[in-house]
Amino acid sequence: MIADALTVCIVVLSRLMYRKGIDLLLTAIPRLCAKHPDLHFVVGGDGPKFVELEQMREKHMLQDRVELVGAVRQSDVRAHLTRGHIFLNTSLTEAFGTSIIEATCAGLYVVTTRVGGIPELLPPSMMRLAEPCDDAIVRETDAAIAYVRAGRHDPLKQHRVVARMYSWDATVRRLEAVYARAMLTPPRSTTERFRRYADAGGPIGGKIICMVIAVQIMLVMVLDWLVPTSSLSLAP
């Protein structure tokens, strides 16, 4: 079990902007530091919210507990991540959290907002999901700190699992499966496609979308007449 006196380090690596949920971080950090006197933050990244983080640190007198390292070069990402025990992500939108994969591969336990494709990235045992609000982030981070302190987190085991999940071989297999499913989907007729466009856009927007698509189809027909597809060399 990790001794209670050991400082727990939470790492943040993000573009410091609104979309990345830095406003949530500005609220969560003082609350977490007040609850855990032995907590330390290392925040990497640059952006328009950097000044606000500095102001928050000064307001709550956390200069010795919140380290703002600025922009982190790609070659230094691993060194930045391995300074901590927990990785905190507060994004408001995220399609695929590359930084989360990097953090788990570096052995960090993850606390992240439940947005976009993040819930599908990793097994529940490797991360805690929070709704994008400061109360939920503080609550899940509290739980993560307790989890790490109890010695239940195994960084080396986690690294091995993630390395297998996101190896090139595994990634290629999943990508091939996506293409295979797409190829099995029967092509839609032009009429059906226009009907779907009209339904999606509503009474006015649907008509505009259909007009734009019709112009695009006519443009393709003209280009195909000028440069027939049969005259093009296809890639192997």
Spell out what each predicted region is:
Residues 92:
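Aromatic "clamp/platform" in nucleotide-sugar-dependent glycosyltransferases that forms part
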Residues 124-135, 144-149:
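Conserved acidic donor-binding segment of nucleotide-sugar-dependent glycosyltransferases
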Residues 164, 169-236:
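C-terminal amphipathic helix plus adjacent low-complexity
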Residues 54-72:
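Nucleotide-activated donor-binding/catalytic signature segment of Leloir-type glycosyltransferases, i.e.
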Residues 109-112:
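Short hydrophobic beta-strand element within catalytic cores of glycosyltransferases
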Residues 78, 96, 101-105, 119-120:
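Short alpha-helical segment that forms part of, or immediately flanks, the ligand-binding pocket
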Residues 2-29:
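Conserved donor-binding/catalytic core segment of Leloir-type glycosyltransferases
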Residues 71-72, 79-84:
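Short alpha-helical donor nucleotide-sugar binding micro-motif in glycosyltransferases
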